[in-house]
Amino acid sequence: MTTTGTTAFNMEFTELAEEAWERAGREMRTGYDLRTARRSLNLMTIEWANRGINMWTIETGTITLTQGLATYALPTDTIDLLDHVIRTQANNAATQADLSITRISVSTYATIPNKMVQGRPIQVWIQRLSGETNPTTAVLDGAITATATTITLSSVVGLAGSGFIRLGTEDIYYGYISGSVLGGVFRGQNNTTAAAQTDGTAVFVPQLPAVTVWPTPDGSQQYQFVYYRMRRIQDAGAGIQTADMNFRFLPCVVAGLAYYIAMKVPELQGRLDMLKKVYDEQYALAAQEDREKATLRLVPRIAFIGGGS
């Protein structure tokens, strides 16, 4: 007998929900059963992000740095950066170089005496914000062109001393506030396009994940910030869509969803202990396999008192 010759098995969300409900102890009967399963799946994938690194969510990205601009937005679904370098002479096979850039804390960045000094960046502070957008009471006090480098607002109450604002579809970075004027402005950030804005345009504050490099890039050469990021797992969608995860996690997602569902249904809570045990076991199996398998070599650093290091 022959085998199928295929390795494409996956499960649509409706199938995941049906299997989870059956494991929890009863059939999925109503539209609400499907809706509550979708909500539980979204919460569970957030739990997975809190547990650690999910290899299938690692993506690479590149930001071309601008002279005089220290802070750059990351994609809004970024959870954290795993590694990063500064690239010089990009795309030149003979001279391209990826150079180390050290991650620092907010307290370390805060104690840098001159944050405006320019040079090749050697340190980076990562701001792990939510990606949500908040409204403000401020509006534009006067129209601006697409090239304006200062922006006057009706009020700056609630704005950070520096950061991002959103006008229409354009994200704008400002470096400082003087009175009601935003200065040190860089237009068209976060892959948006600089555009003219009319008087009275509402001001929003996007909580963009971002990196701040130091020294601030100079103009001696072109720098790129190359990073590997961990992104959020995509939302559970409609019934015909598959889950955003590696196939190795399908047994885990079904077991976990069954446990989450049973927590919400009183007549199923007698199965909670068993479902939790199965969920933990399946997660451990999947997480153990979903990892890098590379050689690790540790070398002791030997130093002598009075002899330097």
Stretches found by the model and what they are:
Residues 1-135, 166, 204-309:
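Glycine-enriched, solvent-exposed interface loops adjoining structured elements
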